[in-house]
Amino acid sequence: MLDAGADARAGDPDADADAAVARFVVITGGPGSGKSTLIDALEARGYARSHEAGRGVIQDQMAIGGHALPWCDRAAFAELMLGWEMRSHHLARRAHGPVFFDRGVPDVIGYLKLSALPVPAHLVAAAERFRYRRDVFIAPPWPEIYAQDTERKQDYAEAVRTWDAMVDTYAACGYRLIELPRASVDERCRFVLDAVTAEA
C-alpha cells in the first residue's frame, strides 16, 4: 500500500480528480526489470510511493496459508490485487507532490489477459475510474538483472510476455508509454524526475 503517512480519505474518488491524476505516476513493466528498485530509490529521495500489489498479496496469502496466489487461483489473486490498487489510489490523495505507483489498476487487466482469463466488467470500470498521469513509465525486459525468488516464480520468457501485455493494456486504457533506459538506478531516477518535473 501507499507510504503517505495518512489514512484513506472517505468520499468520491473523482473529487479533485484532475489535480490528483497529474501527480499519480505509474511505473510498470515485466517482473525483474528494476521497477521496484527504482521506486525504492525515489522513496529514499523523499517521494511518496505505493508498494507492488502482487508481492504484497503473495506475502499476505502465504502468511495465512491462503490460496489467492498466482500458482493456485489467478482470478482470486487478481481480485485482491485490484482491491490493493484501489486502496493505494485513495491513500495517494493525502500525499503531497508526485506519488510513484509500483504498477496500477491496468496491470491487473494485463495480468488476466496474460493468464487467458476473462476481464470482468467491474475491472474495466475500475480502470476508467481510478486514473493516473497520462505518461506511464515502463521498464523493459532486462535479462542481465533478471532473477527469480520465492515470490517471483516466472521465467524470463514470461517476464517478456508480461512486458508485452502491459504495453498493450496501458495503450488500450489511453496512456502514453515512456520506456525507461537500461541504466543505473541513479540515472533512471534522474530520467523519471526530469520528465515529471518538466511538466509540473
Model-derived features with residue positions:
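Extreme N-terminal, non-catalytic leader segments
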Residues: M1-R23
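Hydrophobic anchor at the beta1->P-loop junction of P-loop NTPases
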Residues: I27
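Conserved substrate/cofactor phosphate-moiety recognition/catalytic segment
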Residues: E43-W84
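P-loop (Walker A) phosphate-binding loop of NTP-binding proteins
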Residues: G30, L42
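A glycine- and Lys/Arg-enriched "phosphate-lid" helix/loop adjacent to the NTP-binding pocket
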Residues: A116-A183
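Glycine-rich phosphate-binding loop used to anchor ATP phosphates in small-molecule kinases
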Residues: A78-R131, Y146
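Conserved glycine(s) of the Walker
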Residues: G34
